[in-house]
């Protein structure tokens, strides 16, 4: 336990780690309306999600290093200002090209909530306590994307898709004031600013780590599945099956329930089983769930509304339960060898997996063909990526038993 722990507001940490995911998913129920409102193609509208992750990846690469130089608190406040400007821009666009540009800026600012929050937690907690806090954060990461489509479905249905961005602009103001008043500096007093040469050497060392690449695959594939679902599912369930946006938003509750139950179970099992074993179980759940989902769509069962949707709900529950087992256990172990340069290492780690998320979500937009099959097939393929990642990670002897 660090001395910084006493000054750390868990409520604020949950809000800061959650708002980027809310920003990503809040307008997904309105994607068909965005396409028609801006006279844009489905592929270009879905690209607004991929561009979000590109901006996020670049932001993650920079904010951690900035926080090592000027402090966690200053970096967080700067990022929230950029996020607010980008969000207001999104609310006033008249073309999909403008939306792409403002979404990039919005994501660049929002990324501060991900990388700096994780760095603050690593500054403030150690060992098993850190793992438990990451379990709590994983629950927030699971629930915050669920809030997005649930809230966004109602907002879009009654106020239009632009209203989603005005809600996010208000959120940026609230978080900015809360952070200014409550967020304390957690950068260690003995922390030394890292030079450009040392950043390069750190990057080279991290890129040579097989275990770290395993964690990069785990985090990027789990998020790729989550946001690929939010990207493609509106066209499957709203356009093809005729769901109302507000009803579609309930899928967020399904995802949140599955991942939070898994995170809770992981919290209880960490004293009995290694994190690596739990990650492997999670990867198996994702692959099996995706395979069954693909099978029912391929056999045409999915087109029978009640039967198909019911089976899809069950398979999605299994998939996101598996994701809930993977994320907290991977995040808590990924950067343990780089504790003294947590901000910069977190930037490199986060930048790598967000670039992969960009690739995955772009692939989902390319796979879109007007049928339901690309979504489950995409999930199954990423299940294989998770299986590979779970085999690449290695924890030191004795450490797993304590986690």
Language-model features: where?
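Juxtamembrane intracellular "pre-TM" segments in multi-pass secondary transporters
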Residues: 1-2, 184-215
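Extracytoplasmic
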Residues: 8-42, 63, 229-234
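Helix-breaking motifs and short loop linkers at transmembrane-helix boundaries and internal kinks
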Residues: 37-39, 71, 92-98, 109, ...
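Conserved MFS/SLC helix-loop-helix module at the cytosolic interface between two early adjacent transmembrane helices
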Residues: 58-97
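Structural signature of the two symmetry-related core transmembrane helices
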Residues: 74-89, 277-293
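Paired small-residue
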Residues: 82-89, 97-105, 310-315
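Helix-loop-helix hairpin linking two adjacent transmembrane segments in secondary transporters
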Residues: 98, 135-181, 250
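Cytoplasmic helix-loop-helix junction between adjacent transmembrane helices
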Residues: 102-143
